[in-house]
């Protein structure tokens, strides 16, 4: 790979590619045709986490991705049943809930922390491994933990694991995020669905999912 002349290193150019000074688009022709839009992973994963709550959830147009498969495996570990029917995923969150996610499953999906709010809301406690192990200093997960504490969750750390408990049940509260984190917003929304009272999230994320 080499840098195109005049770009000061900002835009690398692959060897063997023709350098273009500009891209000219001539319109005027009517566009037509059919395009199939696949489901978005960033929307599917928090929905799958929320489907751990009581009742059956059917997610149509669910993408066939490794993260989605990992999420279904986590649901199965937690006591839910999840299976594919064509392009849909059917999840039944009824029955007893296992409150622990093994470290192996946590590492398969980068955003697996989004399951924390759902587990606590359903079971009242959760034990999961810390993403990245015992790190020093501020961590991305701290946003999630601080937000859930505002809903009454008591959180402790034990040799790379998080122990999260609620004395009675989750309660509503005002959650102010230091910055609009998508994952923390999703976690609070899922947990607040079964909390008693109203929850307000300030500085919430505005992404479509």
Model-inferred region functions:
Residues 2-5:
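Short linear segments in intrinsically disordered or otherwise low-structure-confidence regions
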């Amino acid at each position: 790979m080499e840098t195109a002349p005049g770009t000061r290193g900002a835009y690398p150019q692959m060897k063997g590619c023709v350098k273009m000074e500009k891209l000219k688009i001539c319109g005027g022709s009517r566009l037509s045709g059919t395009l199939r839009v696949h489901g978005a992973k960033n929307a599917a994963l928090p929905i799958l986490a929320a489907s751990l709550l009581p009742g059956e959830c059917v997610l149509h147009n669910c993408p066939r991705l490794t993260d989605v498969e990992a999420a279904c495996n986590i649901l199965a570990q937690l006591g839910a049943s999840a299976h594919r029917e064509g392009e849909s995923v059917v999840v039944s969150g009824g029955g007893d809930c296992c409150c622990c996610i093994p470290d192996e499953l946590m590492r398969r999906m980068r955003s697996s922390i989004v399951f924390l709010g759902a587990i606590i809301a359903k079971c009242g406690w959760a034990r999961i491994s810390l993403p990245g192990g015992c790190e020093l200093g501020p961590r991305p997960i701290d946003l999630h933990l601080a937000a859930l504490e505002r809903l009454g969750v008591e959180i402790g750390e034990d040799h790379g694991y998080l122990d999260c408990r609620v004395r009675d049940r989750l309660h509503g509260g005002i959650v102010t995020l230091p910055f609009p984190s998508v994952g923390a917003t999703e976690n609070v929304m899922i947990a607040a669905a079964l909390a008693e009272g109203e929850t307000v999230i300030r500085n919430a994320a505005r992404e479509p999912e």
